[in-house]
Amino acid sequence: MSLRIVRLGSERHPDEGLRIGTVRRPPRGVPKQDFARRNFFDVWLPLLAPSEPLLREAQAAGAVQPGGAQAAGRVQGGGADERSWRTFVRKFRREMQRPDAARTLDLIAALSHATDLAVGCYCADETHCHRSILRELLTERGAAFAAGEPLNPAKKSL
């Protein structure tokens, strides 16, 4: 029983279990019935994605890429300045302190001890993506990660 942090649309691990999409929007141009078949997600949980206002603010500051559903929540790797990234991290962590989000994170952490789960986003680079922050938040809550799953791929948040 364990948790993985994944890129949505990537090939599934054999023991991955339920894949949860923590993105603001579902994949553009993909019929709902194909989300799981095409390895996006089994369950959509936008509650654990950055809010629309935070995404707009981060895009304006250059911390995240503007674009369609695939880019929603994608933080630029390399080109993002660290101050913008730190601001994004601080504000996203604050959003995840809301009772509904905090309880959901607690639930996922607890479930990781009872079943196999995966949480993901579309971003290619986890180090500059909200899923790296979710990884930290779930680690802080005692989530059981899959063997070989990095606990902290590149500590970027403050």
PLM features: residue spans?
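Residues lining hydrophobic/aromatic ligand-binding pockets adjacent to catalytic sites
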Residues: 1-158
